[in-house]
């Protein structure tokens, strides 16, 4: 990956958009976005996935989703509205910066989940390869809309890398594609889809909703294998 692809948790000189409303619980609302897609159904014959942290504390059960037999996923049918929310938040940021509340030179940071995040959380493992390319196309379309609407030199984009980290630590069931290959290919693709004028970062996280570790692993996992 190019040198501009950082792995810092925060980007110096930026202020992040506020996550409220449906985004208060990060990407949890994407479960319903996927369930509402005409090509996806609830896998009622498959046990729900229990989202729990390392000590067994459980936060919720997630009904598993799958692609309907014979259906074809289409990026045009995915409606996350990330671009709309970012552009709306930008207007407030821009006004506050013009008023001097936010210092000049501070960039507006837009944080987005990777396509792997809702896929690993919600889909049956066998259908991951069907959904990831579709979500990738959709999310890069959202990035393109943001890049066209906002001044690229005044914004920063952050791909939140969480599910990839806990997958690397053995949290998820294996799928048909090795998660290491899937992760590396995905992070490169979504990074390459961000215009060069936009500052880009990849923060790595394995925190639960309780701000504790999801995995019990104490030894850092090498991403160079």
Feature names for model-found ranges:
Residues 1-155, 159, 167-170, 175-179, ...:
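Alpha/beta catalytic barrel-like cores
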Residues 155-160, 198-212:
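Aromatic-lined carbohydrate-recognition surfaces of secreted/lumenal glycan-active proteins
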Residues 163:
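Active-site-adjacent pocket scaffolds in enzyme catalytic domains
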Residues 184-198:
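Extended, H/D-rich, highly charged conserved domains that either
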């Amino acid at each position: 990956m190019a040198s501009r692809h950082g792995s810092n948790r925060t980007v110096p000189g930026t202020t992040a958009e506020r996550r409220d409303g449906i985004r208060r619980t990060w990407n949890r609302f994407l479960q319903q976005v996927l369930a509402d897609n005409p090509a996806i159904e609830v896998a009622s014959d498959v046990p729900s996935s229990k989202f729990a942290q390392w000590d067994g504390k459980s936060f919720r059960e997630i009904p598993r989703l799958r692609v309907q037999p014979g259906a074809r996923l289409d990026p045009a049918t995915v409606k996350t509205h990330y671009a709309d929310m970012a552009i709306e938040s930008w207007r407030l940021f821009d006004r506050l910066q013009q008023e001097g509340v936010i210092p000049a030179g501070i960039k507006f940071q837009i944080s987005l989940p990777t396509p792997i995040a809702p896929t690993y959380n919600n889909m049956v493992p066998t259908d991951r390869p069907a959904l990831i390319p579709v979500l990738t196309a959709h999310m890069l379309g959202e990035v393109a809309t943001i890049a066209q609407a906002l001044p690229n030199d005044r914004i920063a984009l952050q791909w939140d890398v969480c599910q990839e980290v806990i997958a690397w630590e053995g949290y998820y069931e294996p799928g048909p594609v090795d998660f290491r290959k899937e992760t590396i290919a995905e992070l490169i693709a979504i990074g390459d889809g961000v215009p060069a004028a936009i500052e880009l970062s990849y923060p790595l996280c394995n925190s639960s909703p309780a701000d504790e570790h999801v995995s019990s692993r104490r030894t850092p996992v090498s991403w160079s294998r």
